[in-house]
């Protein structure tokens, strides 16, 4: 496994771990009915969470090659691997079209 795949997997685990806490803090920060002191306090708590626990830090990568671009979300594989597996018949329900 390449280092990028391992790093991305760790980020996904961190996102799952801190997801509820991050959503809670963000909701309090964005609530304008609360006093500013409380909002700033939770904004500070939000900034203390690990950076890699943010969803935007996760990169969709191919699970076979680690390729970061042109990855199908449904299969989590790149277009190149998808084409190889489809032509071999390894993907159930996917046929190479010919006309």
Curated annotation (Swiss-Prot):
<dbReference type="GO" id="GO:0005739">
    <property type="term" value="C:mitochondrion"/>
</dbReference>
<dbReference type="InterPro" id="IPR018271">
    <property type="entry name" value="Ribosomal_uS14_CS"/>
</dbReference>
<comment type="similarity">
    <text>Belongs to the universal ribosomal protein uS14 family.</text>
</comment>
<protein>
    <recommendedName>
        <fullName>Small ribosomal subunit protein uS14m</fullName>
    </recommendedName>
</protein>
<dbReference type="GO" id="GO:1990904">
    <property type="term" value="C:ribonucleoprotein complex"/>
</dbReference>
<dbReference type="Pfam" id="PF00253">
    <property type="entry name" value="Ribosomal_S14"/>
</dbReference>
<keyword id="KW-0689">Ribosomal protein</keyword>
<dbReference type="GO" id="GO:0006412">
    <property type="term" value="P:translation"/>
</dbReference>
<dbReference type="GO" id="GO:0005840">
    <property type="term" value="C:ribosome"/>
</dbReference>
<keyword id="KW-0496">Mitochondrion</keyword>
<dbReference type="GO" id="GO:0003735">
    <property type="term" value="F:structural constituent of ribosome"/>
</dbReference>
<keyword id="KW-0687">Ribonucleoprotein</keyword>
<dbReference type="InterPro" id="IPR001209">
    <property type="entry name" value="Ribosomal_uS14"/>
</dbReference>
